[in-house]
Structure formats: structure tokens, C-alpha cells
């Protein structure tokens, strides 16, 4: 557990040029707090304490402004920069070394049972304000531009221009 905490702190130091040292990150970075909160809520969820997981996740959202459903699967070295307004849905899956900016939604497109949120591959970067909706896949190493609306699969190592992705 301590190794994972240090790994999360070091990830912030590597990905955010404003981060100067571990203590600063641990005390002042809401994205890191949300990831830690999610790891605890997810553990509770997996162990069958679903109500407590939801209550705890709601508390984390109130404190950080970041909503991650406790059932969502989040990989290692996940970093949320700034974070306010981030929403990650129940069936979302996020790979390792993923970075997202503020106001990103990994959401569903309609009410449905089963898989309804996106799967994000390893080493993906998602720009501020992006909306990735539905049970789609964003391939490994892809970069999603700010304010994009993505409703279909994105191949691995794709650097999408927002004009190619935005739909009304």
C-alpha cells in the first residue's frame, strides 16, 4: 500500500511541472486525493460493502470535485490534473499511465444494464473538457484533444484533432 501511495505521488511529480515535492502533492493535489479515495472505495466495493463504498465515494467527490464510481477499474499511475468536474462512470475501465485533465467525462450514452462506459487503454492522455461516451475503446497511447466528444472507438496511438471528434 505504501509503495502504491509513493508511486501515485511520483506520478504527479513526473506529470505536473507545478509539483515540487511529495509532501506538497500529498497535501494539496485533489486529483491525487481522488485517486486515493477511489482505491479505498473500490476495495470496499469489491469486498461487498457497496453502500459504504458509495457513501465514501460521495464524500470524496464533495471534498475534491471529482466523481469516480467505486466500481470503475482504474490502473496504476493514473493522474488527474486539476480535476474539478471529472466524472468516471461505473463500468469505465482506465489503463495504466493514463492522464486526464479537468472536466472530463467517461460516461454512458443511454440507460442500460451491463457495460455502458468507455475502456481507456494504457498511456492515454485526455484533454480538458473531453466527453468519452458509451461502451467504446480508446486504444493504447491515444491522445484525445480538449473539448472533444468521442462516441466511437479510437485506434491505438491516434492523435485526434478535435474537429474529427466533435459531434453535436
Model-derived features with residue positions:
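Terminal amphipathic alpha-helical/low-complexity segments used for targeting or macromolecular assembly
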Residues: 1-64, 166-168
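Left-handed beta-helix
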Residues: 64, 69-70, 75-76, 81-90, ...
